[in-house]
From Swiss-Prot:
Residues 723-786 form the R3H domain. GO terms for molecular function: 5'-3' DNA helicase activity; 5'-3' RNA helicase activity; ATP binding; ATP hydrolysis activity; ATP-dependent activity, acting on DNA; ATP-dependent activity, acting on RNA; DNA binding; DNA helicase activity. InterPro entries: AAA+_ATPase, AN1-like_Znf, Coronavir_polyprotein_1ab, DNA2/NAM7-like_C, DNA2/NAM7_AAA_11, Helicase_ATP-bd, P-loop_NTPase, R3H_dom. It comes from Homo sapiens (Human). Expressed in all tissues examined. Expressed in the developing and adult human brain, with highest expression in the cerebellum. Moderately expressed in fibroblasts. 5' to 3' helicase that unwinds RNA and DNA duplexes in an ATP-dependent reaction. Specific to 5'-phosphorylated single-stranded guanine-rich sequences. May play a role in RNA metabolism, ribosome biogenesis or initiation of translation. May play a role in regulation of transcription. Interacts with tRNA-Tyr. SUPFAM superfamilies: AN1-like Zinc finger (SSF118310), P-loop containing nucleoside triphosphate hydrolases (SSF52540), R3H domain (SSF82708). SMART domains: AAA, DEXDc, R3H, ZnF_AN1. Zn(2+) 2 binds at residues 913, 916, 930, 932. This is DNA-binding protein SMUBP-2. Homooligomer. Interacts with RUVBL1. Interacts with RUVBL2. Interacts with GTF3C1. Interacts with ABT1. Interacts with ribosomes.
């Protein structure tokens, strides 16, 4: 009789599974009721307008039907979809939206067709006409839930059998038995490290339970394979399971290399092509009875065709009876062949649910297996683990409960305990008595590993010497650049206005700004020689994954873009993470799952780039540790370094001639804090020695962390960044403007934040500023702008032309110009040209010299020097009134985008802003982008107040009067009409008299 603990567990699990099932059914129902078929097809869960192309009989007499798009001319291809082999689908008639004809399993999916396997029970109900149109819709998996419930009920009723002692241990009714002695082993894999060898010995010596905890990259699968091989060597029969087909196939591939007799159970459609030779189908096809089975199938196909052709009811009945007899014989012969195949295999592999009693394993005795191995146990529902556990006296669980938990649809069921895996429950209950942890990882650079080790694995992990310092630049054909020379890169979007999409009807989240940053970083890696196939882009949100695919797949077909859940167990040389969340509320939502972030970061081998808004993610403690770690041990960049047209928060034209100055406004006092977009590059062990002096103290949050301010000679005094550093750069630039020098170079010792400051200050003063060089040799050159276009029309050197004057630093009034006077670096200042022209006219009127004398540059020079002495900011220009040059400059200004730094032409495509009377390109035509945001809002408020129209199409304000006021006006009108009528009556009487 089952214990109280078992009964309580089974009752609770059945209730939670019912919640989960109801949630999944409700989700599928909402798809069908609330979403159009076209929308379902665009989401990839439905295929419309299909026709039947072929039918045949498959394994176990199943009917295989191939569907393809209905052709209208040339051959058509299927639309983009998420259908994969093994999915359960419903077949519908296109003419009848609500009627489901049958359910089946996808066996093959290509770009032009899909093949569905239907059970034999559908054969006679299905009458598929090649001329009709059909559709396929993904369905919830009823089979899985039925098997889970069946296993729980079997656990509750379990009295005596091979798993009795194991059940007592797993539910805490008895302690694990003492370990047995193991003779010294000869390992099949001679490259195992100490922790792996210890785990193998421990697993083999335990009598009921052993847990192998394998953090990312520690060779967990290698260890599990060694355990299986050693068990087979001892003469044990092993049942090896995992929650997913991919995990099982991975074990099959590894065991096949060791020449073991293995058998893979499962639907043929769900197996990788590389291991199908080890599947039950393939083994049966190679058996002695294969030809007889093939002949019986052929007979079934022939009788089935005859049944379709005949119209006689008696003949149809005879054909059906014949098919039933043939299928019975087919089943008997297949079962005999299956039993022979099962008993000849040393290792049988299947998914947890594939090991159920209603599958091929029902042919074996109850105590056939000696040990059950469950890989990736931490990702499996505990109920699914009990399907194989009831078949053996000992179990070995392997996985990592610090990574993703089992996937569930019902949030309520997950919180109530459905997401608690068997491995996590037992590890917390028994601890080191049953757990062995692998400690040497063979995947990640030590800088990538250390964060995960410290935050998730108690600092137990160490990097193997072969991977401890490997970088992208060490790959063959990859150049050494800033991107390929760092293992950790943080691109901070804080303060850049790259907010997430706010779609009320979207459950998922997206961020187009981060998509652009990802694209630019990938291009930098590819340009450096990193193959796109070695790069992965990972995001926690499916909507962001879709946006990334739309933007990147056509340029980089080999690039892999997946969600975090879809990438667990995988690895790439470079991984780019898009965290998506960027909002003023500081909500992180889905990112709050610590284990999901652990999985995302630990997929990378040599380089991981995190793109996020530090101001948002720092609201979550765990994410804050990640940002702080990248800040201290990696390179930090702001999104401003990637995107030229970023619109920072609080953007305004009022205080500068460019966008950079407004972007640098901190949220707090300028002397003590700065925004997250202005982070300093952090030092790292694998970076250049110059960066080592810029490491920041540990334990401080990113928001309050103070970067070091390096001096121009390469020093890096510690302390909080103050206004003095900015003032130092500003003083240098002002001194340069007052000097006769035309160019000023800043040394390469500046970090990225200092370079950003220099760019901003140079832009404020209207100077040119360019960054040159790569890596440690990157420096900034600030230069004075070339003379105005009119200077080119003056006389050549040596002909008495005017000598060029040095630029004069602009006054505060000049730096605070209104928005309409914003201009790009190559656009002439029309206001200055106009003032110079007026000055020349006045000068000509006050000087009685001849026109020839006025045209002489040498006679004009003394007067200009005199005017300069009086403090007028005039610029030396030729004395001729070049009206054509003025017109040409005006035309050029009208044909160029008015946004600072933008030189795009607006002759063909451009938008005119009525607020500032300038033309802008399509990237900058919105008032909020080019600096007219406040004016646009004021204009909109005035229009709404005047017209009563909130937005286009909302209609106008009701113009009807208030009823009381209308009645009052009506009374006044009636009174006035009465008075006028009385006046006319009195006049008539007077005339009559």
């Amino acid at each position: 009789m089952a214990s109280a603990a078992v009964e309580s567990f089974v009752t609770k699990q059945l209730d939670l599974l019912e919640l989960e099932r109801d949630a999944e059914v409700e989700e599928r129902r909402s798809w069908q009721e609330n979403i159009s078929l076209k929308e379902l097809q665009s989401r990839g869960v439905c295929l419309l307008k299909l026709q039947v192309s072929s039918q045949r009989t498959g394994l176990y007499g199943r009917l295989l039907v191939t569907f393809e798009p209905r052709r209208y001319g040339s051959a058509a291809a299927l639309p983009s979809n998420s259908f994969t082999s093994g999915d359960i689908v419903g077949l519908y008639d296109a003419a009848n939206e609500g009627s489901q004809l049958a359910t089946g399993i996808l066996t093959r999916v290509t770009q032009k067709s899909v093949t569905v396997a239907f059970d034999e029970s559908h054969d006679f109900q299905l009458s598929l006409d090649r001329e009709n149109s059909y559709r396929l819709l993904k369905l919830a998996n009823d089979v899985t839930y039925r098997r889970l419930k069946k296993a729980l009920i079997a656990l509750k009723k379990y009295h005596s059998g091979p798993a009795s002692s194991l059940i007592e241990v797993l539910f805490g009714r008895s302690a694990p038995s003492p370990a047995s002695e193991i003779h010294p082993l000869t390992f099949f894999n001679t490259c195992l490290d100490t922790s792996q060898k210890e785990a193998v010995l421990f697993a083999l010596s335990q009598k009921e339970l052993a847990i192998i905890h394998g953090p990312p990259g520690t060779g967990k699968t290698t260890t599990v394979v060694e355990i299986i091989l050693q068990a087979v060597k001892q003469g044990l029969k092993v049942l090896c399971c995992a929650p997913s087909n991919i995990a099982v196939d991975n074990l099959v591939e590894r065991l096949a290399l060791c020449k073991q007799r293995i058998l893979r159970l499962g639907h043929p459609a769900r197996l990788l092509e590389s291991i199908q030779q080890h599947s039950l189908d393939a083994v049966l096809a190679r058996s002695d009875s294969a030809q007889i089975v093939a002949d019986i199938r052929k007979d079934i196909d022939q009788v089935f065709v005859k049944n379709k052709k005949t119209q006689d009811k008696r003949e149809k009945s005879n054909f059906r009876n014949e098919i039933k007899l043939l299928r019975k014989e087919l089943k008997e012969r297949e079962e005999a062949a299956m039993l022979e195949s099962l008993t000849s295999a040393n290792v049988v592999l299947a998914t947890n649910t594939g090991a159920s009693a209603d599958g091929p394993l029902k042919l074996l005795p109850e105590s056939y297996f000696d040990v059950v191995v469950i890989d990736e146990c931490a990702q499996a529902l505990e109920a699914s683990c009990w399907i194989p556990l009831l078949k053996a006296r000992k179990c070995i669980l392997a996985g990592d409960h610090k990574q993703l938990p089992p996937t569930t649809v019902s949030h309520k069921a997950a919180l109530a305990g459905l997401s608690l895996s068997l491995m996590e429950r037992l590890a917390e209950e028994y601890g080191a008595r049953v757990v062995r942890t692998l400690t040497v990882q063979y995947r990640m650079h030590q800088a990538i590993m250390r964060w995960a080790s410290d935050t998730m694995y108690l600092g137990q992990l160490t990097a193997h010497s072969s991977v401890a310092r490997h970088l992208l630049r060490d790959l063959p054909g990859v150049a050494a650049t800033e991107e390929t020379g760092v293992p950790l890169l943080l691109v901070d979007t804080a303060g850049c206005g790259l907010f997430e999409l706010e779609e009320e009807d979207e459950q998922s989240k997206g961020n187009p700004g981060e998509v652009r940053l990802v694209s630019l970083h990938i291009q930098a890696l590819v340009d450096a020689g990193v193959p796109a196939r070695d790069i992965a882009v990972v995001s926690p949100y499916n909507l962001q994954v879709d946006l990334l695919r739309q933007s990147l797949v056509h340029r980089h077909p080999e690039l892999e873009i997946k969600s975090v859940d879809g990438f667990q167990g995988r690895e790439k040389e470079a991984v780019i993470l898009s965290f998506v969340r960027s909002n003023r509320k500081g909500e992180v939502g889905f990112l709050a799952e610590d284990r999901r972030i652990n999985v995302a970061v630990t997929r990378a081998r040599r380089h991981v780039a995190v793109i996020c808004d530090s101001r948002t993610v720092n609201n979550h403690a765990f994410l804050k540790t990640l940002v702080e770690y990248f800040t201290q041990h990696g390179e930090v960049r702001t999104a401003f370094e990637y995107l030229d047209d970023i619109v920072p928060e609080n953007y305004s034209h009022e205080n500068s001639q460019g966008s950079s100055h407004a972007a640098t406004k901190p949220q707090g006092p300028a002397t003590s804090t700065r925004t997250g977009s202005q982070r300093q590059e952090g030092g790292q062990e694998a970076a250049a020695p110059a960066r080592q002096g810029r490491k920041k103290p540990a334990g401080k949050s990113l928001a309050s962390e103070a970067p070091s301010q390096p001096s121009l000679n390469g020093g890096s005094p510690e302390g909080v960044e103050s206004q003095d550093g900015v003032d130092h750069f500003r003083a240098m630039i002002v001194e340069f403007m007052a000097s006769k020098k035309m160019q000023l170079e800043f040394p390469p010792s500046l970090n990225s934040h200092d370079r950003l400051r220099v760019h901003q200050i140079a832009e404020e003063h209207g100077l040119r500023h360019d960054s040159s060089g790569e890596g440690k040799r990157r420096f900034i050159t600030v230069s004075k702008r070339a003379p105005r276009p009119r200077a080119a029309l003056g006389p050549p050197a040596g002909t008495g032309g005017p000598a060029p004057l040095q630029p004069v630093p602009p006054t505060p009034a000049q730096t605070e110009q209104p928005p309409r006077e914003q201009r790009g670096p190559d656009q002439p200042d029309l206001r200055t040209l106009h003032l110079e022209r007026l000055q020349r006219v006045r000068s000509a009127q006050g000087q009685p010299a001849s026109k020839e004398q006025q045209a002489s540059g040498q006679q004009k020079l003394p007067e200009k020097k005199k005017k300069k002495a009086k403090g007028h900011p005039a610029t030396d220009l030729p004395t001729e009134e070049d009206f054509e040059a003025l017109v040409s400059a005006a035309v050029k200004a009208d044909n160029t985008c008015g946004f600072a730094k933008c030189t795009a032409g607006v002759t063909t495509l451009g938008q005119f802003c009525q607020l500032c009377s300038r033309r802008y390109c399509l990237s900058h035509h919105l008032p909020e982008i080019h600096g007219c945001g406040e004016r646009a809002r004021a204009h909109a408020r005035q229009r709404i107040s005047r017209e009563g129209v909130l937005y286009a199409g909302s209609g106008t304000k009701n113009g009807s009067l208030d009823p009381a006021k209308r009645a009052q006006l009506q009374r006044r009108l009636d009174k006035k009409l009465s008075e006028l009528s009385n006046q006319r009556t009195s006049r008539r009487k007077e005339r009559g008299t």
